[in-house]
């Protein structure tokens, strides 16, 4: 019986450590991250943080951790929005060019008008078509802006997804469904000069599934970004 006691205690300690790591992933991640910071090891920092920040750190301490938020993976919808706006933009190119051509023809007629009446009529036509073209062109610029934003948002989300999954590329990554886990962690950092500053670290982990192939992709906790908050 005495021999079994150390084994039981050892197993209990192991279970405790596993549960601690499971429920407090930020502690282990940030411990490894700040160890790399202390060594000025940018390569290792870059394996844990998308945007590693070079900090002068004497000591650090976690001061608060938000509740873990879980929400559906957003990349499929972001990709859908990007493709829809791309189609709208491409379709609108023809409309914009047609309006420009019509305006150019009217301006040509104005240049070649010989009588005052003809010039007045041509000028009125140009004014009308110019206003119409300006409106269409503004619509085109707005579509271009929306498309650029949607494209950037989808690309950013894809980058974070791949980083959490530990993949350089995944052909169908934009089709994967599942959950995004996120936390915000505030850390008090004391610099080597003794100055205190609080940084907020934004952490995420992706648990996704390829429904077509029936494969699960379990991501790791990573630092998406950090910023000073006080």
Task: Indicate where each model-derived feature is located.
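Sec-dependent bacterial lipoprotein signal peptides
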Residues: 1-19
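Bacterial signal peptide processing site
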Residues: 20-24
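Short, aromatic-enriched amphipathic alpha-helices that serve as compact interaction elements
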Residues: 25-41, 45
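Short, well-ordered alpha-helical segments enriched in acidic and aromatic residues
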Residues: 41-57
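Short, charge-rich amphipathic alpha-helical segments embedded
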Residues: 52-71
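Alpha-helical linker/edge segments of TPR/alpha-solenoid repeat scaffolds
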Residues: 72-90
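Exposed beta-sheet edge and beta->alpha loop/turn motif
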Residues: 87-230
């Amino acid at each position: 019986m005495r021999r079994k006691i150390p084994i039981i205690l050892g197993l209990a300690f192991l279970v405790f450590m596993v549960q601690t790591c499971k429920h407090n992933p930020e502690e282990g991640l940030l411990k490894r991250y700040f160890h790399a910071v202390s060594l000025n090891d940018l390569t290792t920092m870059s394996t844990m943080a998308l945007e590693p920040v070079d900090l002068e750190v004497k000591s650090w301490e976690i001061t608060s951790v938000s509740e873990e938020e879980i929400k559906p993976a957003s990349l499929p919808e972001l990709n859908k929005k990007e493709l829809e706006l791309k189609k709208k933009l491409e379709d609108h190119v023809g409309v914009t060019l047609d309006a420009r051509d019509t305006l150019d023809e009217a301006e040509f007629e104005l240049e070649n008008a010989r009588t005052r009446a003809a010039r007045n009529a041509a000028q009125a036509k140009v004014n009308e078509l110019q206003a119409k073209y300006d409106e269409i062109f503004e619509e085109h610029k707005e579509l271009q802006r929306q498309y650029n934003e949607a494209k950037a948002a989808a690309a950013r989300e894809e980058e974070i997804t791949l980083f959490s999954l530990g993949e350089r590329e995944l052909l169908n990554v934009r089709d994967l469904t599942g959950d995004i886990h996120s936390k915000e962690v505030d850390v008090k950092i004391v610099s080597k000069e003794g100055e205190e500053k609080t940084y907020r670290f934004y952490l995420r982990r992706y648990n996704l599934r390829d429904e077509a192939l029936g494969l699960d992709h379990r991501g790791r906790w990573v630092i998406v970004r950090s910023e000073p908050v006080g």
